[in-house]
């Protein structure tokens, strides 16, 4: 029996905390919602609210709730079947959260998002304003991807990455990724008894990504690899991220108190400004740009804009104002940014000096291909 929350250490100054609850946490590995465990999770969130912290819930479980409500129907494994279950289950899921938080006199507000809500800068800002309005009025936002209408093209993809984007929208201090694993290990603990828990991560590199693998649970869409992606995005925005076991007693309150639980990802000392956060978290890249060694050095070490002279190759089709990824000639991802020229135009000015752009195209949108204010180093 764990001690009551009131006996625990004092919580740090008021924070905004995103709690991401995966399907495996909400179902306990079964085919239906584990309501007893949801009660416990809500108790901890209510404790945080009592002490002035703002809490955002990013919840999975709509499809599981829909399947349970319809008495586990046999459906074809299609997008339409998933959307059917999500449409039925989302209303059941929000009712569960509303009922449980109501025990503590707390109100919830539902936000259903798609990729399209984040791609467009104006819609992104509207979503941010709505989220902040809920928080400022003492309402707990309960966020999920709108699976009932989301197609492959407009899906965020998983609630791990969605929670990172929501954390950026809400100006969060912490993102708690609760899963069925205690954290990130040096090997898969399910088949390697020598695997050790990684307590703290300062840099996310290829070695760490390989450790994360790519497996996912049967009911959910996110594995450890997607959690690592989410952590990388969030920490660049100045958000501390912790991956921990959702079944651990008092896990939410302990993490909020700063206890050493799970795997902690330290945020960058100098987080990205608002516009660059949107570039990192918002629109998916529409194409790729390969740059030479000189341009790579200028972008990475001097924070320079990307000039057409340094471009070696343009891949994919994108329009002016869309986001592209930037690679070096070895295929290493360096950055992403908003393009001043379309892929057609860029292909024509590859390797050209800035003063040659007008001569080649017959018009110009400035001397740079991507301005440094629109460029985010990865």
From Swiss-Prot:
Its EC number is 2.7.2.11. GO terms for biological process: L-proline biosynthetic process. It comes from the Bacteria. This is Glutamate 5-kinase. Substrate binds at residues 60, 147, 159. It holds the Pfam family AA_kinase. ATP binds at residues 20, 179-180, 221-227. It comes from Photobacterium profundum (strain SS9). One of its GO terms (molecular function) is ATP binding. Belongs to the glutamate 5-kinase family. InterPro entries: AceGlu_kinase-like_sf, Asp/Glu/Uridylate_kinase, G5K_ProB, Glu/AcGlu_kinase, Glu_5kinase, Glu_5kinase/COase_Synthase, Glutamate_5-kinase_CS, PUA. CDD domains: AAK_G5K_ProB, PUA_G5K. Gene3D superfamilies: Acetylglutamate kinase-like (3.40.1160.10), PUA domain (2.30.130.10). Catalyzes the transfer of a phosphate group to glutamate to form L-glutamate 5-phosphate.
């Amino acid at each position: 029996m764990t001690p009551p929350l009131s006996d625990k250490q004092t919580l740090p100054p008021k924070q905004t905390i995103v709690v991401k609850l995966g399907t495996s946490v909400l179902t306990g590995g079964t085919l239906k919602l584990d309501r007893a465990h949801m009660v416990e999770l809500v108790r901890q969130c209510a404790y945080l609210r009592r002490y002035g912290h703002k809490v955002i819930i990013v919840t999975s479980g709509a499809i599981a709730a829909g399947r349970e409500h319809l008495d586990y129907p046999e459906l074809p494994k299609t997008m339409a079947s998933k959307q059917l279950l999500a449409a039925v289950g989302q209303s059941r899921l929000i009712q569960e959260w509303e009922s449980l938080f109501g025990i503590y006199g707390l109100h919830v507000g539902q936000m259903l998002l798609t990729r399209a809500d984040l791609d467009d800068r104006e819609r992104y800002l509207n979503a941010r304003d709505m989220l902040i309005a809920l928080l400022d009025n003492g309402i707990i936002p309960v966020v999920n991807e709108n699976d009932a209408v989301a197609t492959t093209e407009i899906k965020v993809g998983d609630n791990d990455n969605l929670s990172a984007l929501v954390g950026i929208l809400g100006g969060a201090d912490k993102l708690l990724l609760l899963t069925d694993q205690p954290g990130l290990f040096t090997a898969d603990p399910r088949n390697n008894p020598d695997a050790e828990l990684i307590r703290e991560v300062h840099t996310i590199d290829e070695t760490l990504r390989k450790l994360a693998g790519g497996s996912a649970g049967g009911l959910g869409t996110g594995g450890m690899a997607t959690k690592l992606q989410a952590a990388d995005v969030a920490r660049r925005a100045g958000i501390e991220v912790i991956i921990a076991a959702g079944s651990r007693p008092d896990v939410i309150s302990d993490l909020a108190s700063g206890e050493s639980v799970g795997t902690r990802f330290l945020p960058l000392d100098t987080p990205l400004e608002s516009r660059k956060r949107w570039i990192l978290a918002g629109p998916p890249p529409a194409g790729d740009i390969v740059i030479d060694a000189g341009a790579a050095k200028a972008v990475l070490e001097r924070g320079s804009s990307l000039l057409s002279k340094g471009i070696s190759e343009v891949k994919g089709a994108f329009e002016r104002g869309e986001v592209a990824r930037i690679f070096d000639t070895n295929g290493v991802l360096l950055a992403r940014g908003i393009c001043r020229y379309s892929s057609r135009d860029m292909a024509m000015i590859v390797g050209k000096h800035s003063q040659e752009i007008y001569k080649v195209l017959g018009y110009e949108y400035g001397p740079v291909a991507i301005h440094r204010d629109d460029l985010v180093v990865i």
